[in-house]
């Protein structure tokens, strides 16, 4: 066991826990975006950063282990400023209209939607190439959750991965194949962990587009017949 101080409170915890684990055990509201209980923590989004005295940079709580003697601040002015900036940058570059948890975070941190007015927004055509789900990468914030559950964290299918570099980075299939041409088994786990609606059940998407359940059934039947030929 180790002893540390978090937000002024001294506590003893089991060795091997992350700072996020400790914070949650204390009931602290440390926000996360890329982190999910079903995936391996990777520290990509940096929303869970906390301030550790003696460390110059803020530390991602999801991957940094609690250490003996640490003095941690989960909501200092520096932490709040960093989280707010991350949210404002995300909001200025992509469509977060269906990201309910992130919308709640933006209200909590009182973000300014106009802070980065000249930011280039991520644009992408909706990919509707399979009967299970659609892919709208204009809503994708590259949290990596879908890639992880498609790979070692759950399915071991490896149908999707990162492609491109810098601002052009996006989630895609190898050689830009359609989903039916990949190793995807349509398990739906990627859709389940997506925090923004970038991956969405196809039926839900078509209903939002104004189609009736009957029209969707006819559409799916036609797709199955074409596939059988």
Which residues fall in each region the model found?
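Residue-level recognition of oxygen-bearing side chains
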Residues: 18, 145, 189
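Fe-S ferredoxin-like electron-transfer domains
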Residues: 46, 55-183, 192, 197-229
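N-terminal cofactor/phosphate-binding cores enriched in small/glycine residues
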Residues: 11-68
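Eukaryote-biased recognition of intrinsically disordered, low-complexity regulatory segments
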Residues: 1-9
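Short glycine-rich loop/turn motifs that provide flexible caps or phosphate-binding loops at active sites
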Residues: 7, 15, 42, 163-165, ...
């Amino acid at each position: 066991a180790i002893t540390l101080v978090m937000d002024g409170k001294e506590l003893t915890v089991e060795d091997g826990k992350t700072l996020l684990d400790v914070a949650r055990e204390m009931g602290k509201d440390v926000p996360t975006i890329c982190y999910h209980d079903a995936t391996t923590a990777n520290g990509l989004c940096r929303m869970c950063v906390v301030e550790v005295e003696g460390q110059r940079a803020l530390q991602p709580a999801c991957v940094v282990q609690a250490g003996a003697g640490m003095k941690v601040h989960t909501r200092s002015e520096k932490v709040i400023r960093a989280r707010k900036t991350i949210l404002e940058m995300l909001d200025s570059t992509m469509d977060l209209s269906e990201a309910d948890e992130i919308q709640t975070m933006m209200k909590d941190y009182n973000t300014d939607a106009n802070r980065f007015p000249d930011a280039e927004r991520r644009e992408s055509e909706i990919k509707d190439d399979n009967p299970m789900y659609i892919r709208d990468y204009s809503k994708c914030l590259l949290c990596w959750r879908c890639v992880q559950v498609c790979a070692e964290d759950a399915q071991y299918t490896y149908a999707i991965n990162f492609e491109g570099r810098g601002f052009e980075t996006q989630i895609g299939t190898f050689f830009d194949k359609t989903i039916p041409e990949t190793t995807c088994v349509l398990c739906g786990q990627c859709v389940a962990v997506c925090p923004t609606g970038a991956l969405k059940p196809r039926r839900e998407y078509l209903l939002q587009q104004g189609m009736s359940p009957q029209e969707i059934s006819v559409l799916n039947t036609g797709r199955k017949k074409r596939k059988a030929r």
